[in-house]
Amino acid sequence: MLIKELITRTEKEYMIITLLKHYKVEKVKVKYKSMKDYAHYNVDTGTLELSSRYKEIKPRQMKEFLITILHEIRHAMDAKKYGWRKFKQMYEMEMNMISQGHYPGKDDPYKDNKYEIEAESFGLKNMPRWKSHFSKK
């Protein structure tokens, strides 16, 4: 039921809470913020920031929305696993190594960052399962 029509803010919050609990990062705070992307995980504050621009999610936007949320949850899982300071340090070290040319063929500190690649892969891999799960509700 959730995905057949527009996804309201309440349904969106239910989906996010379900995902946070499933991946055992339920202590992550969720807040709305004006931004272009659907979501961003702020490692400094342990906050999943959701875009206030997308009050409702259309069915055609659902895949991208779920991939993004799962991607950001992966960052939260890494922050929990390593500790937020250590994860931030590792992430920034990876960005610096790419920027300084230590990895041949890699030149974009964001897109070529192994933590971003892992998070995107996690989102793509898990999206079909959750899309199906939320479609049945």
Model-derived segments and their meaning:
Residues 8-12, 62, 66, 111, ...:
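Hydrophobic (often cysteine-bearing) scaffold residues that line and stabilize catalytic clefts
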Residues 29-63, 76-80:
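Active-site scaffold of zinc-dependent metalloenzymes
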Residues 72-89:
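Catalytic Zn2+-binding segment of zinc metalloproteases
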